[in-house]
Amino acid sequence: MLKYLFAVQTIVLLGFFPGSVHSDEINLPAEILNLDGDREYGEYLASDCKTCHEADGSGDGIPNIHGRPKIQLITLLYAYREKIKLNEVMQMQAGRLSNEEIVALAAYFEGLN
């Protein structure tokens, strides 16, 4: 039993669970990094996001994305779109987004508190 617990702890610490890719392991292409992001366009696109990612954190285990750093949101959305991070719902949502839309959403959500 003790060996089993140690193995589980090791797996958790090393991040081998699906979707546990860290942002520093994702190489964003220059074309997405060079975009500024239109906050107004991001607000227009955000209605689908707000359905699950509620501002008050009441999303039943779904992370609050309001006020997160722009680069973090860009990295996460890019990783879901490219299927680097594993979550079927997020892969489907991000899979429909262009680089411009990803950056616009990130700019919009970064500005919210």
What are these regions, as identified by a protein language model?
Residues 1-4:
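Positively charged n-region of N-terminal signal peptides that target proteins for export
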Residues 24, 95-113:
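C-terminal capping alpha-helices of c-type cytochrome domains
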Residues 10-11, 21:
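Cleavable N-terminal signal peptides
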Residues 22-45:
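Electrostatic cytochrome c docking/interface patches
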Residues 39, 43, 58-85, 91:
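Gly/Gly-Pro-rich "capping" loops immediately C-terminal to redox-active cysteine motifs
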Residues 42, 47-56, 105, 109:
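The canonical Cys-X-X-Cys-His
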